[in-house]
């Protein structure tokens, strides 16, 4: 049972909150920003349909450098 619990925890995503400082990889390299919104239902962003749920939310993040708004799953983010 301990092994099963350890494996489950290994793959659990970190939960983030509005205002958290995070970073992620982009085509231009590592980017950092602040979470401004959390989506727990499917939503449209910049012409694309993003899938989100209570179990796997997506986050809107405002870039510190460019003010660009990006949408990512928690698995793509690193808390700063």
Language-model segments: residues:
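Short, Lys/Arg-enriched N-terminal segments with co-localized hydrophobic residues
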Residues: 1-11
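Basic/aromatic-rich interaction segments and small domains that mediate binding to polyanionic partners
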Residues: 13-75, 80
């Amino acid at each position: 049972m301990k092994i099963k619990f350890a494996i489950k925890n290994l793959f659990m995503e970190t939960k983030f909150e509005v205002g958290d400082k995070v970073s992620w990889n982009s085509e231009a390299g590592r980017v950092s920003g602040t979470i401004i919104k959390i989506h727990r239902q499917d939503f449209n962003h910049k012409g694309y349909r993003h899938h989100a749920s209570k179990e796997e939310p997506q986050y809107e993040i405002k870039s510190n450098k460019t003010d660009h708004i990006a949408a990512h799953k928690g698995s793509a983010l690193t808390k700063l």
